[in-house]
């Protein structure tokens, strides 16, 4: 067990060091894009599956409530929370469209879509990023290494 824990911690340290050298430009670009979006009165739509759905909800909560400092609420919405909408779309269309349909209904040019997918290959995340681009939104993908199928439909890739 000791070796397993040591390996996990060492991997975490390695990934953080790697982010400093390999991801700082993309992280800065994402921060600038989100700042511009919110400052101009637009909103952020976040989505993902499983643990990524939980991450999307957590991020949206931090934007809407507050993060570290008292401030005005910021427009962010996790598309993973309305079970009636999700199951209706999944039933009437397909599970692959549960986020794209919501992006189409709620997104506008100037908004930012943030898709989270560990593999980068979740069909419903890819479809939502594609729909966001189609309607004039900017896109950010948070994925595992390489970005998978999300990479070509992301304006900014954080992998």
Describe the role of every protein-language-model region.
Residues 141-156:
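Short, glycine/polar-rich helix-capping loops at beta-to-alpha or helix-loop-helix junctions
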């Amino acid at each position: 067990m000791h070796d397993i824990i040591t390996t996990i911690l060492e991997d975490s340290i390695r990934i953080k060091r790697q982010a400093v050298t390999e991801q700082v430009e993309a992280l800065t670009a994402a921060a600038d894009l989100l700042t511009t979006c919110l400052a101009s009165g637009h909103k952020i739509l976040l989505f993902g599956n499983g643990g990524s759905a939980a991450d999307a909800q957590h991020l949206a909560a931090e934007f809407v409530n507050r993060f570290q400092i008292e401030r005005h609420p910021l427009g962010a919405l996790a598309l993973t929370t309305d079970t009636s909408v999700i199951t209706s779309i999944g039933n009437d269309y397909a599970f692959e469209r549960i986020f794209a349909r919501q992006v189409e209904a709620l997104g506008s040019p100037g908004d930012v879509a943030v898709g989270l997918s560990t593999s980068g290959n979740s069909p419903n995340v890819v479809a939502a990023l594609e729909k966001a681009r189609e309607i004039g939104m900017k896109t950010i993908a948070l994925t595992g290494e390489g970005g998978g199928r999300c990479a070509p439909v992301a304006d900014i890739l954080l992998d």
